[in-house]
Design a protein with these regions (language model features):
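N-terminal metal-binding scaffold of metallo-dependent hydrolase/deaminase domains
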Residues: 1-42
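Divalent metal-coordination and catalytic microenvironments
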Residues: 21, 26, 53, 64, ...
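Residue-level structural signal for beta-strand termini and adjacent loop
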Residues: 33-36, 61, 245
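Short loop/helix-cap segments at secondary-structure boundaries that form the rim of catalytic
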Residues: 34-44, 156, 249-251
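Metal-associated gating/positioning segment near the N- to mid-region
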Residues: 46-113
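Residues at the C-terminal ends
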Residues: 62, 124, 228-230, 251
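Metal-coordinating catalytic core of metallo-dependent amide/deamination hydrolases
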Residues: 99-115, 120, 128-244
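Active-site-adjacent C-terminal substructures of enzyme catalytic domains
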Residues: 232-233, 241-259
């Protein structure tokens, strides 16, 4: 048979004529020359698709998205073009803060309809699995609402994309907690995270570990609590300043350190 290609082996292209890809239970079980004619009962056991003249590709996995949110931030694009930094836009009420306000003012139907549109676009581009994050509520009600929207879309019998949900309550410090970041971390751990876990709304917990947002110590405390509650870990790490988020991800055996 054929084993997986790794490293420089992936540069080698193997062309097979009259080839077959067999899939059983959602798992690729054979790739190689067509061997169907020589096997008794082969045609009775499998569905057959003639892909002559076509290209068969694995579905893309988009492992970091924020596709459930309210509002738009198109005007910020021009600000960035003029050289304004991500953090300065956020400090004057733009960025995440702007989207939080719009998301809090959206209901389930509005958020679901918008998110479903994004998923359809992803599907057309070949995405079959997507990780989706909350993080535009920054309060208990809206964080849970975002995650419930994702669960609803994932349970839809007509869905085009599989969804893996991540709780990102520590995406930013909300206006009502400015200057009290430790209190906000306590609120997430004591009030929001248990509800996420009890309702089985997420598989992962993420945190924006960044200067001016959540420190290494605050991120460690939040992620340790998440791990103790049974959530796997992710981090937004070292996006703007090399704070040490990647090292924290390694320390806590996180699944990923993004950005």
């Amino acid at each position: 048979g054929f084993s997986a290609r790794c490293g420089r082996e992936m540069e080698e292209i193997c062309i097979m004529d009259d080839a077959t890809v067999e899939v059983t239970g959602g798992v690729i079980t054979y790739v190689g020359p067509n061997r169907g004619e020589d096997r008794d009962g082969y045609y009775q056991r499998y569905w057959h698709y003639n892909a002559r003249g076509k290209c068969l590709l694995p579905g893309f996995v988009d492992s970091h998205t924020h596709f459930v949110f309210g509002g738009e931030r198109a005007e910020e694009f021009s600000w960035r073009l003029k050289g304004e930094s991500y953090m300065s836009i956020m400090e004057r009420g733009g960025g995440i803060v702007s989207t939080v306000a719009a998301t809090r003012n959206s209901n389930f139907i509005q958020l679901r309809g918008k998110a479903e549109g994004f998923l359809k676009q992803m599907s057309v581009m070949g995405v079959t699995t997507v990780e989706g994050k909350s993080g535009y509520g920054l309060d208990k009600e809206t964080e849970l609402l975002q995650l419930r929207v994702m669960r609803s879309l994932n349970n839809d019998e007509h869905k085009r994309v599989d969804i893996v949900s991540t709780f990102l309550g520590a995406h930013a410090v909300p206006q009502e907690y400015v200057g009290r970041t430790d209190d906000y971390v306590d609120f997430i751990i004591r009030e929001v995270m248990p509800a996420v876990v009890q309702n089985r709304l997420a598989e992962f917990c993420d945190v924006f570990c960044e200067q001016g947002v959540f420190s290494i110590g605050q991120s460690r405390r939040l992620l340790t609590a998440a791990r103790d509650m049974g959530l796997a870990l992710k981090l937004h790490a070292d996006e703007i300043v090399p704070l040490g988020g990647a090292g924290l991800a390694a320390e806590l055996s996180a699944v990923s350190a993004d950005h």
